[in-house]
């Protein structure tokens, strides 16, 4: 079996795009096209023709513009509202520079010598499905896969400036700027923000630690109780540091970088100390690993210990939750203890884009949910106790750890210290972000709703009350 590199050299992965042609056209540089787009007003009507002409840009082959989301690439119905002109130009000219989450490529090699390249569409215990540039679904049985890896090159071909003229390119950008569907949706809710006004008083953001303290992609911080000086900082790559604000010193507590799977939405994402710390010296982590090709979320308990050689460290790992995902996307982020001393876990739908398996509405899976467990007790065959007042504790088929459902990517969760409310920031699909207050047993809508707007009825349950967000806003606002 040849490694991927050998197959690529042989030219099998032709779906990636013709980088040679791009390199052979120095007179049509990216800089020139960028300059033209910045200084010239194009014709959006002609640009629509370029978009749809498969012998020209051919964008229609992979992208829908009507919200149908039928292609292998993102739906572009709102792209003009989401991106400014500079970002549009960069995305078209250099598609691999910043690939949208959920649209990265996956390369699979089989024991028969076949190589497949596409966007992950579906993953099960028996097979993997990829969607190709022709929006064709390719199914590969798991027992035939000998190698699987994430690609770094977009399925959208490089070198569009070698296939269309400069005038056509400017027209294409003008057409993309007109695609502003989300701005026109009739959303009537006090919680929908069409714009964010400037604050009456400016707010200054200042570094929390001294400038000499540097971190590599810090994603979470946990203060030591009754201690205004020391904090634990977690880095996405798998390291945890004990940091002193006063002395600007940092001490390595944990390094699981060899175990953690680091990517756009994966890595060491959450850390929290036991509510009775340091009397109870347990620390809890949430991170992702690659387990035989499946992205798997781990919620783990460790002990705050001492090492005569290295000082303090997090030791004695004990796995609490192991949640197998479908793709690398939407694994949630935070874990937090509530005022009831229960551990709450935000878990995303795990993809692929648009939640085609309906994880958010499926009570038999932990994906797309807020979970609640008691880590101070144990049930039979479980390393934790399921609280008796969890809303689905008596449900015949539901996972009893579920506290609330209908989430896409609950990246951050936090409890209000005054009201005790659970606030959740949920990342949207193509159009809207949302912030919600989440209570016991509530259904927050994904993928039936995205924010306040309808998204899909495919997995709409019967006779279900959906709880809208407190605030929702278009992605163009940040």
Predicted segments, located by residue:
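Post-cleavage N-terminal segment of exported redox proteins
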Residues: 2-44, 53-54, 65-68, 82, ...
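Electrostatic cytochrome c docking/interface patches
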Residues: 25-54, 72-74, 84-87, 111-114, ...
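Primarily the internal scaffold of c-type cytochrome electron-transfer domains
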Residues: 33, 42-45, 71-103, 151, ...
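C-type cytochrome heme c attachment motif
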Residues: 49-65, 74-94, 104-107, 114-129, ...
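Structured surface patches comprising rigid loops and adjacent beta-strands/short helices at the edges
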Residues: 135-155, 213
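Intrinsically disordered, low-complexity linker and terminal regions at domain boundaries
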Residues: 147-171
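Beta-propeller domain segments
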Residues: 181-203, 226, 234-237, 268, ...
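Acidic, Gly/Ser/Thr-rich repeat motifs that build Ca2+-stabilized beta-propeller blades
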Residues: 185-354, 412-415, 420-428, 478
């Amino acid at each position: 079996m040849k490694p991927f590199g050998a197959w690529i050299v042989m030219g099998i992965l032709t779906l990636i795009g013709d980088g040679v042609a791009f390199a052979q056209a120095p007179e049509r540089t990216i800089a020139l096209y960028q300059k033209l787009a910045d200084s010239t007003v194009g014709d959006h009507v002609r640009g629509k023709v370029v978009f749809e002409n498969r012998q020209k840009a051919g964008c229609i082959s992979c992208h829908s513009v009507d919200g149908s989301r039928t292609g292998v690439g993102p739906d572009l119905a709102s792209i003009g509202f989401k991106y400014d002109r500079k970002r549009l130009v960069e995305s078209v000219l250099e598609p691999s520079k910043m690939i949208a989450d959920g649209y990265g490529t996956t390369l699979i090699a089989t024991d028969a010598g076949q190589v497949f390249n596409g966007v992950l569409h579906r993953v099960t215990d028996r097979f993997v499905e990829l969607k190709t540039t022709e929006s064709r679904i390719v199914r590969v049985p798991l027992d035939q896969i000998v190698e699987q890896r994430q690609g770094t090159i977009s399925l959208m071909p490089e070198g569009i400036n070698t296939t269309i003229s400069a005038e056509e390119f400017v027209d294409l950008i003008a057409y993309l700027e007109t695609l502003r569907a989300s701005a026109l949706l009739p959303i009537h809710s006090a919680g929908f923000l069409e714009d964010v006004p400037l604050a009456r008083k400016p707010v200054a953001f200042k570094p929390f630690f001294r400038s000499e303290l540097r971190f590599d992609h810090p994603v979470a911080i946990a203060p030591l109780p009754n201690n205004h000086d020391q904090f634990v900082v977690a880095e996405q790559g798998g390291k945890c540091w004990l940091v002193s604000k006063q002395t600007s010193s940092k001490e390595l507590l944990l390094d699981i970088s060899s175990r953690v799977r680091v990517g756009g939405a994966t890595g060491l994402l959450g850390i929290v100390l036991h509510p009775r710390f340091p009397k109870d010296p347990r620390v809890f982590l949430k991170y992702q690993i690659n387990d035989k090709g499946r992205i798997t979320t781990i919620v783990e308990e460790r002990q705050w210990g001492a090492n005569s050689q290295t000082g303090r460290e997090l030791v004695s790992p004990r796995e609490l939750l192991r949640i197998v995902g479908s793709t690398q996307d939407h694994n949630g982020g935070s874990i937090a203890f509530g005022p009831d001393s229960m551990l709450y876990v935000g878990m995303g739908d795990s993809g692929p884009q648009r939640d085609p398996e309906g994880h958010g509405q499926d009570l038999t899976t932990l994906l797309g949910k807020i979970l609640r467990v008691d880590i101070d007790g144990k049930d039979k065959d479980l390393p934790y106790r399921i609280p008796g007042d969890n809303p689905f504790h008596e449900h015949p088929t539901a996972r009893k750890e579920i506290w609330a459902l209908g989430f896409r990517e609950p990246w951050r969760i936090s409890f209000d210290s005054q009201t005790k409310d659970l606030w959740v920031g949920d990342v949207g699909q193509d159009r809207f972000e949302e912030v919600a207050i989440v209570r016991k047993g509530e259904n927050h809508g994904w993928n039936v709703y995205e924010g306040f707007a309808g998204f899909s009825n495919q997995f709409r349950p019967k006779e279900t009350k959906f709880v809208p967000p407190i605030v929702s806003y278009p992605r163009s606002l940040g």
